[in-house]
Swiss-Prot record:
<dbReference type="InterPro" id="IPR005878">
    <property type="entry name" value="Ribosom_uL1_bac-type"/>
</dbReference>
<comment type="subunit">
    <text>Part of the 50S ribosomal subunit.</text>
</comment>
<keyword id="KW-0678">Repressor</keyword>
<keyword id="KW-0687">Ribonucleoprotein</keyword>
<dbReference type="InterPro" id="IPR016095">
    <property type="entry name" value="Ribosomal_uL1_3-a/b-sand"/>
</dbReference>
<comment type="similarity">
    <text>Belongs to the universal ribosomal protein uL1 family.</text>
</comment>
<comment type="function">
    <text>Binds directly to 23S rRNA. The L1 stalk is quite mobile in the ribosome, and is involved in E site tRNA release.</text>
</comment>
<dbReference type="GO" id="GO:0003735">
    <property type="term" value="F:structural constituent of ribosome"/>
</dbReference>
<dbReference type="Pfam" id="PF00687">
    <property type="entry name" value="Ribosomal_L1"/>
</dbReference>
<dbReference type="GO" id="GO:0006417">
    <property type="term" value="P:regulation of translation"/>
</dbReference>
<keyword id="KW-0689">Ribosomal protein</keyword>
<dbReference type="GO" id="GO:0006412">
    <property type="term" value="P:translation"/>
</dbReference>
<keyword id="KW-0810">Translation regulation</keyword>
<dbReference type="InterPro" id="IPR023673">
    <property type="entry name" value="Ribosomal_uL1_CS"/>
</dbReference>
<dbReference type="GO" id="GO:0022625">
    <property type="term" value="C:cytosolic large ribosomal subunit"/>
</dbReference>
<keyword id="KW-0820">tRNA-binding</keyword>
<dbReference type="InterPro" id="IPR002143">
    <property type="entry name" value="Ribosomal_uL1"/>
</dbReference>
Amino acid sequence: MAKLTKRQKAIAEKIEAGKAYNFEEAATLLASLPTAKFVESYDIAVNLGVDPRKSDQVVRSATVLPHGTGKTVRVAVFTQGPAAEAALAAGADRVGMDDLAAEMKGGDLNYDVVIASPDAMRVVGQLGQVLGPRGLMPNPKVGTVTPDVATAVKNAKAGQVRYRTDKNGIIHTSVGKVGFEAGKLKENVEALIADLKRIKPASSKGIYVKRVTLSTTMGPGLIIDQSSLNV
């Protein structure tokens, strides 16, 4: 059995395995634990009562968190004409068509979100092998293929998170930076869960939100007592 590091021992001494924590208690406890040498994020994992093997039970969406994620988001937009001007005015870091595609094929992929207007998909479609593995391929289901690229840029910059159930029916996303006020962090999580409930698959039976777990980037996951959330 691997030997625990000093940091792991210090963390193990402070947490109770299997305990369901009040949200504010969990957030405060996680923030008090020994940290990595960078500003960690708060991450949420939500176990859903869905069968991800069934296409009609795959949960996929995007939502703008009321207090953002604390991250600086770089956005590239494929569009042209007046929409290009609107995207730049909304804060896009790069706007283009074939020129932008050439840059990305050449390895310039320093973006967190890629957005496209429908008429630009003829160009974006050639980038599937480049953008797909990085989770950057624009998709109408999460609002990144849209004629209203300006609003999509504003949402991305405001802290919109995108998520999709994994093979175990769990969604994972960042909900803020360590250092966020617990109240603001809680409101971000509540907004996310409200969105999950809004798009609950009609064929999902039984308990839908089965478990909510809060963690930091390098820290342990703490089970959240859902009664401490206003959802």
